[in-house]
């Protein structure tokens, strides 16, 4: 019998020498072509490595080999060698090479097949925990199929002698430099580091080792020396404090990722890497390892051993500047790779003194271009490339009064040698003559002999060869014959207007013959106007009209003419039946349909702003093109354009241009007519026409002839002509990035305009020298100089030098008497609360705020916000404030916010005695007490928030009043604003949706997948290079969730911005600003009317309980306890997934992240909750900052939590208020404290740790916002404790459609099992265990349900008799809540309402009755059956007799 070893040799090309080193116990193969090789004895890592290499030479196709070591009788310390090997080939597991018998004890549990690791090194322990599953999976690949790891952190030092302890300490101090291979190397390199100077250049004299091109770096190499430019630098701070540096570098062949890890603290290489800039040229010696995070696992990356800087800047090729008027930026939707900042930098660096921008259809780059060019010696010419549509799109030429029924038609087609009659010829004519829907005579067909030879492309398309036309008549004779056939009849052709009729006319003129004057019907245009088809090719129309069409016979003139005759019969009938068209003269007027305009191709033009006054005209034009004249894309009519003739400069575009197309297809007189339309002529680069050349539609020589004609005709007409390459990217090499756009479908699945071209035109910036070289075909240096240099200078003088696209200063709307109304209302409310004699603190604060508000014209914002809140409250919906508005006491007294920013205080509601407690953290933490004067229980309030955080230190910052309305009420609030200011003065704040990092990565990866086969390995560094070019490219427009922009009545929106529909959806009721609101923030006021679930839930709670949220007590020890202790709910952690807090489902505190913060901080007061809210919403405020400080012993009240804390704390430290404010502003914006301010702080003994903490912060939350959030959270917690059923019913009612009754109906144990399964799979990297987005969304719902059940309540099943459409029903009798119908997945609100309406009329008697009287679907019915909801109903009313 054949041995297993011998059998294995038949499968793999293995040498006898290697085969003798292994003993195979078993070979098994599964259905998925996996071969499992089981060894008798333990096989070490070097042999496994050799076997892995041999596995690639398997003799069996697609066989995957898995080696399985014998784990039973082996010293498991041997796996250390496997750890070393894994660390060499997996960069993010490099810490494994630090594991040794000094820091790790290894044991094996054979019963569980589990490896037990006892680690005394915290960093290794942390890394192992974080990467446990990945290591387990990789070990299986390396023949070690452990089922699990048990990992323990233990102090092993007592087991070691002094020498070993010293070795351990040395490893601990160095192991996070994970790129070192041996302990000796670590020691040597550490000594080397210490000897370097502060301006460390990792090795000053690069070694003589040969430079390896990046494309040649491969996994089989151990190390290499590279020279490359840095194009991406990423720095990550690990939990351990170590720093991971990743550099993506590029040379002229490829890209590569190189990386290193450094310990926290000072390190010579750290300074070098921190200061390393993008575009610097570096040399590095690297060890080459595999990037195990890559998809293939075969991508090499480099571990930096040595590195130095060779050049400070990436020196790109020098260019000679040329004025270019048609730069395109990333605001041309998915169509350019030039960012606005890059454009300005490019212009400045290359000494372009003037640049023009003409993004396609939009002017959204204007604000950034103006911003970035402001301090540069650079003139901007603001332009636009857009599409012009004729006011009446012709479907019939040479219209006459002719009844369609009694007319005679010649239905014809021609075949030609190409598309362009100026360079191509007719080679076949076919026709049929039709009258009264019947063919007259025989079909007509004849060939025409061209002067030029018929090439292979033409033969392939038309099935006409040169041999077939050799004996045919010449073209002039043929044209005379065609005219005779046409007589005075009506002509019918498919695409006749743009091709057949024009082609014949141009060839007639070529031969000195009169052009056609016959009425001509274009069936392609009619189909576009009347047929809702996607394709209007003749074959596609035949299929829809049920006309026979043979693709093999198509594209021959006679066949196409016969088929078209049948199509025209159907079409003519439809014109009468659907449009009442009986006369030829009616077609053009009655068929100007939206479908026609959606499908017609217009003329692309470039428009430019001459002076400041014309900015408004451009904005009007852009607005109209995006709204009134939007036909699947922005367009503008010829007549509208004519009205702007004296206000905007107009030139032709280089693509899809009537003028450029006319050079190929029209006669000189027509070309002259078109030239006269333009203020100047744009001569395209030859490269811009290469798509036509490569498709063999025209030769480059003929393009040159056409361009010469354009130049000489323009000169003849005294029109200035200038050269343009219309750049979409800077350099020729950048075209590969542009190719991503060309091969990526845009929004709504629309293909890029060049997607079907065999060659994408060249659209880089062509500098002066190369432009001159290109125009050498003119053979006239003076003329070339005129076009390249002199004319652009002349045109430049037409434009003002200082056009500003944005207005400066605030333009607030005016309302008569609004200042006095505000003053009166504020004092009325203040005195109502605090008494006629206002406390000094209150009086001073009101005066201070009102002075600023009225002085800067902000009263109207406050007053309208007050009216909005008042209306919402009257309609039964509370409003929550966001942002810093709670910093304003005036806002409090106008009822805009519930937050009181005063110093914490007691207030007697009876006698108005007010007592301010200056040393208290928060008014809601003041212990209850009675008034000393009248014994009435005193109220408490005041959160100690400075006004400066809202309107700035001088009170002149434009106010952002953000209000949270109920989601169901938001639209009402929006329309309330519109009713006050009017539709033409109220706009939604616009947003611009750009390609984000993840989207760009997916797009680029898909591009590579489509371009290359799956065996082609694309490095992640290459993907990142492409991503960098694509990221931030505009995809679409949108609208701020609630921002409403107000334009003063004395102005037009066009004084500030164009407008459009969000995402160009013409069905939207609101228009948005074309510019993103961030650029209008300082000139126009915005009301943030946001939709939120919280006000909706609180409204439901009021309906359920009868208790208004305003009556919820804000001091309650049990509520306070619930934030950190689940026992406040009378349950234990073990009852709810080991949760220790009672904060599940509490807004802003219910997420797993914030619940973890609650555990860490153990809040004891309302002030603590505000701090936690601030910490959780900031960036780099908690993690790696406050969290560490608290763990080191600092109290929660000591750390920086909210931005206001900085100002108030520093003022207490005797910092001058303005300086404290400025420091706060720097810190909250992510800027470090200025050196001069740090000196002041240190002089005033502000702790160093405080300064360091502030300097880590990237963004800070305002205290007023945090306070508003906490107030809502507190109310939720109160209802949750005292009205639990009502609370859960309200909470789930707002989220009723995000529910899985199939899981929930099976009880607590099953829900917990489902939750844990999602949890485990979410941590797995196995694609088979991928968690769906719905499962992730349901996980927090399961938490809440488990808590509800643990508290002794129930969720009943859906009830046909009791369930409501969208809200939960409270069943007190059964201590339960009953879900609504929309809790069933897929059952929408419309269906749910139909069930309620039918039930209100009559109870459902049977399932059939339910089905007949509601809109319920088959799937809904099935789900109801599975849930057992219909068990008590019979199927039908029929009786069973037996």
From Swiss-Prot:
Can you say where in the cell this protein is located? Cytoplasm
Give GO terms for biological process. DNA-templated DNA replication
Which EC numbers does the record give? 2.7.7.7
Q: Name one Pfam family in it.
A: HHH_6
State where it is primarily located. cytoplasm
Q: Which residues cross the membrane?
A: none
Cross-referenced SMART domains: EXOIII, POLIIIAc
Catalytic activity, reaction form: DNA(n) + a 2'-deoxyribonucleoside 5'-triphosphate = DNA(n+1) + diphosphate
GO annotation, cellular component aspect: cytoplasm
One of the entry's Gene Ontology molecular-function terms is: 3'-5' exonuclease activity
**UniProt keyword Hydrolase present:** yes
Alphabetized NCBIfam families for the sequence: dnaq, polC_Gram_pos, PRK00448.1
Q: What does this protein do?
A: Required for replicative DNA synthesis. This DNA polymerase also exhibits 3' to 5' exonuclease activity.
The protein's name in its UniProt record:
DNA polymerase III PolC-type
């Amino acid at each position: 019998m054949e041995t297993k070893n011998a059998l294995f040799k038949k499968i793999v090309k293995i040498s006898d020498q290697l085969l003798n080193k292994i003993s195979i116990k078993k070979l098994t193969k599964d259905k998925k072509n996996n071969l499992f090789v089981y060894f008798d004895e333990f096989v070490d890592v070097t042999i496994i490595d050799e076997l892995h290499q041999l596995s690639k030479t398997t003799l069996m196709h697609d066989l995957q080999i898995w080696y399985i070591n014998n784990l039973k009788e082996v010293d498991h310390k041997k796996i250390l060698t496997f750890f070393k090997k894994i660390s060499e080939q997996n960069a993010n597991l490099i810490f494994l090479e630090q594991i040794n018998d000094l820091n790790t004890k290894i044991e094996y549990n054979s019963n569980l097949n589990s490896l037990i690791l006892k680690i005394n090194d915290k960093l290794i322990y942390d890394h192992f925990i974080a990467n446990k599953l990945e290591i387990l999976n990789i070990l299986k690949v390396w023949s070690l199929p452990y089922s699990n790891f048990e990992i323990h952190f233990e102090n092993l030092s007592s087991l070691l002698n002094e020498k070993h302890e010293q070795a351990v300490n040395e490893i601990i101090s160095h192991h996070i430099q994970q790129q070192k291979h041996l302990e000796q190397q670590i020691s040597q390199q550490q000594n080397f580091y210490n000897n370097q100077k502060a301006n460390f250049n990792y090795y000053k004299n690069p070694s003589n080792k040969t430079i390896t091109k990046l494309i040649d770096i491969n996994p089989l190499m151990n190390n290499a020396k590279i020279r490359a430019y840095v194009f991406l630098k990423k720095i990550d701070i690990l939990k351990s404090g170590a720093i991971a540096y990743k550099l993506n570098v590029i040379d002229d062949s490829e890209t590569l990722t190189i990386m290193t890890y450094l310990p926290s603290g000072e390190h010579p290489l750290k300074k070098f890497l921190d200061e390393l800039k993008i575009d610097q040229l570096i040399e590095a010696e690297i060890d080459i390892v595999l990037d195990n995070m890559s998809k293939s696992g075969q991508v090499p990356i480099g571990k930096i051993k040595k590195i130095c800087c060779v050049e400070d800047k990436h020196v790109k090729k020098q260019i000679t500047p040329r004025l270019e008027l048609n730069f395109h930026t990333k605001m041309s939707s998915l169509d350019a790779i030039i960012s606005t900042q890059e454009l300005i930098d490019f212009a400045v660096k290359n000494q372009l003194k003037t640049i023009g921008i003409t993004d396609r259809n939009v002017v959204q780059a204007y604000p950034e271009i103006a911003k970035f060019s402001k301090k540069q010696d650079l003139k901007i010419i603001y332009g636009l490339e857009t599409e012009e549509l004729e006011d009446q799109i012709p479907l019939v030429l040479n219209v006459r009064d002719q009844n369609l029924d009694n007319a005679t038609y010649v239905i014809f087609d021609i075949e030609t040698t190409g598309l362009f009659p100026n360079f191509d010829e007719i080679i076949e004519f076919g026709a049929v003559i039709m009258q009264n829907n019947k063919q007259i005579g025989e079909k007509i067909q004849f060939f025409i002999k061209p002067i030029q030879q018929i090439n292979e492309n033409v033969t392939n398309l038309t099935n006409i060869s040169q041999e077939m036309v050799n004996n045919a008549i010449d073209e002039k004779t043929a044209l005379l014959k065609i005219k005779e056939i046409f007589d005075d009849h009506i002509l019918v052709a498919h695409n006749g207007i743009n091709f057949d009729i024009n082609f014949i006319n141009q060839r007639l003129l070529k031969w000195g013959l009169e052009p056609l004057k016959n009425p001509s019907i274009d069936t392609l245009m009619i189909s576009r106007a009347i047929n809702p088809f996607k394709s209007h090719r003749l074959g596609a129309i035949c299929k829809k009209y049920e006309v026979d069409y043979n693709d093999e016979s198509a594209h021959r003139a006679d066949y196409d003419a016969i088929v078209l005759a049948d199509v025209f019969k159907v079409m003519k009938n439809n014109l009468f039946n659907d449009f009442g068209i009986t006369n030829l003269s009616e077609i053009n007027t009655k068929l100007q349909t939206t479908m026609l305009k959606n499908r017609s191709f217009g003329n692309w033009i470039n428009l430019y702003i001459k002076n400041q006054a014309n900015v408004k005209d451009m904005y009007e034009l852009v607005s109209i093109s995006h709204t009134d004249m939007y036909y699947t894309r922005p367009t503008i009519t010829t007549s509208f354009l004519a009205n702007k003739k004296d206000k905007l400069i107009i030139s032709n575009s280089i693509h899809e241009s009537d003028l450029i197309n006319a050079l190929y297809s029209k006669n000189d007189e027509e070309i002259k007519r078109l030239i006269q339309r333009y203020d100047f002529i744009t001569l395209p680069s030859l490269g811009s026409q290469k798509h036509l050349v490569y498709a063999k539609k025209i030769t480059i020589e003929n393009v040159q002839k056409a361009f010469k004609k354009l130049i000489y005709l323009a000169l003849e007409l005294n029109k200035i002509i200038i050269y343009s390459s219309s750049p979409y990217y800077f350099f020729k090499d950048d075209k590969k990035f542009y190719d991503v756009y060309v091969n990526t479908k845009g929004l709504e699945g629309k293909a890029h305009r060049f997607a079907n071209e065999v060659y994408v035109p060249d659209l880089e910036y062509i500098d002066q020298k190369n432009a001159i070289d290109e125009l050498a075909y003119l053979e006239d240096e003076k003329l070339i100089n005129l076009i390249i240099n002199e004319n652009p200078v002349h045109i430049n003088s037409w434009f003002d030098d200082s056009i500003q696209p944005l207005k400066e200063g605030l333009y607030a709307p005016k309302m008569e008497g609004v200042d006095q109304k505000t003053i009166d209302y504020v004092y009325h409310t203040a005195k109502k609360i605090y008494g006629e004699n206002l406390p000094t603190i209150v009086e001073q604060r009101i005066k201070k705020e009102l002075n600023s508000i009225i002085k800067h014209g902000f009263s109207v914002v406050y007053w309208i916000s007050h009216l909005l809140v008042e209306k919402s409250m009257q309609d039964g919906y509370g409003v929550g404030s966001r942002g810093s508005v709670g910093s304003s006491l005036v806002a409090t007294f106008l009822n805009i916010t519930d937050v009181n920013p005063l110093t914490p205080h007691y207030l007697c509601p009876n006698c108005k005695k007010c007592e301010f407690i200056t040393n208290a953290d928060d008014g809601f933490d003041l212990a209850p007490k009675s008034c000393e004067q009248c014994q009435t229980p005193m109220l408490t309030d005041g959160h100690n928030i400075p006004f400066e955080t809202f309107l700035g230190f001088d009170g002149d910052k434009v106010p952002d009043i953000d209000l949270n309305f109920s989601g169901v009420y938001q639209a009402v609030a929006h329309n309330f604003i519109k009713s006050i200011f009017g539709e033409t003065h109220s706009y939604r704040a616009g947003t611009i949706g750009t390609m984000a990092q993840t989207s760009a990565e997916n797009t680029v990866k898909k591009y590579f997948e489509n371009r290359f086969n799956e065996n082609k390995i694309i490095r992640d560094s290459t993907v990142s290079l492409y991503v960098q070019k694509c990221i931030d490219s505009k995809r679409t427009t949108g609208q701020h969730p609630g921002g409403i922009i107000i334009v003063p009545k004395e102005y037009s929106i066009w004084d500030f911005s164009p407008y459009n529909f969000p995402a160009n959806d013409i069905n939207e009721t609101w228009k948005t600003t074309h510019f993103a609101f961030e650029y209008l923030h300082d000139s126009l006021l915005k009301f943030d009317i946001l939709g939120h679930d919280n006000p909706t839930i609180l409204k439901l709670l009021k309906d359920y309980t009868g208790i208004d949220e305003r009556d919820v007590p804000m001091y309650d020890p049990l509520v306070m306890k619930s934030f950190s202790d689940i026992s406040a709910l009378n349950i234990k952690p073990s009852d709810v997934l080991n949760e220790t807090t009672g904060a599940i489902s509490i807004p802003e505190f219910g997420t797993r992240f914030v619940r973890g913060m609650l555990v860490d901080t153990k809040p004891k007061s309302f002030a603590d909750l505000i701090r936690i809210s601030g910490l959780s919403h900031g960036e780099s405020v908690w993690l790696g900052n406050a969290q560490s400080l608290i763990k080191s012993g600092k109290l929660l009240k000591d750390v920086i939590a909210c931005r206001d804390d900085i100002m108030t704390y520093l003022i207490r430290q005797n910092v001058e208020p303005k300086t404290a404010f400025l420091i706060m502003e720097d810190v909250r914006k992510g800027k470090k404290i200025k050196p001069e301010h740090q000196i002041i702080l240190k002089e005033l003994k502000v702790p160093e740790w405080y300064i360091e903490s502030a300097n880590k912060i990237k963004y800070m939350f305002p205290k007023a916002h945090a306070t508003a959030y906490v107030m809502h959270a507190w109310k939720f917690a109160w209802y949750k404790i005292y009205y639990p059923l009502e609370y859960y019913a309200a909470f789930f009612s707002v989220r009723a459609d995000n529910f899985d009754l199939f899981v929930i109906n099976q009880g607590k144990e099953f829900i917990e099992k489902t939750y844990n399964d999602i949890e485990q799979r979410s941590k797995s990297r196995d694609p088979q265990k991928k968690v769906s987005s719905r499962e992730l969304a349901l996980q927090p719902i399961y938490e809440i349900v488990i808590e509800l059940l643990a508290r002794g309540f129930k969720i009943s099943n859906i009830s046909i008799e009791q369930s409501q459409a969208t809200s939960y029903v409270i069943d007190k009798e059964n201590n339960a809540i009953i879900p609504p119908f929309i809790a069933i997945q897929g059952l929408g609100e419309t269906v749910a309402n139909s069930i309620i309406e039918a039930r209100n009329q009559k109870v459902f008697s049977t399932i059939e009755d339910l089905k007949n009287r509601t809109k319920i679907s088959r799937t809904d019915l099935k789900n109801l059956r599975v849930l057992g909801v219909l068990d008590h109903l019979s199927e039908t009313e029929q009786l069973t007799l037996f």
